Amino acid sequence: ITFTWTTNKDITTQTLTGCTLADETVRTATYDTDISSDKTFTLSVSDGENSASSSVSYKFMNNVFWGSAAAADVYDSAFVDALSNKKLTNSVKGTYSFNVADGEYGFWAVPSNMTISTVWIGGFEVTVESVGTISYLNSKGYTRDYNLYKTGQSGLGSISAEIK
């Protein structure tokens, strides 16, 4: 994350959460540590008499993955990555549109702090089965437990599934 700022007067000190600033003339900084939880950064400046600060917060979110696939003997990170859709979110609730091909099932992989209890397709409640929890490793080396669910029926065709 790169930060850039300006001041309307000369300052004598400044600090920015998690960043080393060479001196009071610097007006840009980079935070190059991976973020795996919500984080707030605060820039504090002083001219020797008066102080001011400003903060910005980043909300850490995980992906929800969904798509069509054949049932597998082993569910792992590669299986989840092969699902055709993903979105960053802090809630699994919403509408998921995709095609469930013949011989395949609809799958959702959701962070372990989320669960799927009800799925509606075409106005009808449908059964989804939990196929377990996997330890998902993303391309950045971040590991998170994910719950994996699949539709009870295969070959549903083009669907718009609502998770409530």
Give the predicted meaning of each segment.
Residues 3-7, 107-111:
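Aromatic/hydrophobic beta-strand junction motif of beta-rich domains
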Residues 13-19, 154-164:
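Extended Gly/Ser/Thr-rich low-complexity repeat segments
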Residues 25-29:
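Short S/T/G- and acidic-enriched coil/turn segments that sit immediately N-terminal to beta-strands
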Residues 30-40, 48-50, 141-158:
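Surface-exposed, short loops/turns at beta-strand junctions within beta-sandwich domains
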Residues 46-61:
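Short, exposed coil/turn segments at beta-strand boundaries within extracellular/luminal domains
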Residues 63-104:
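Extracellular receptor-binding modules and their adjoining Ser/Thr/Gly/Asp/Asn-rich linkers
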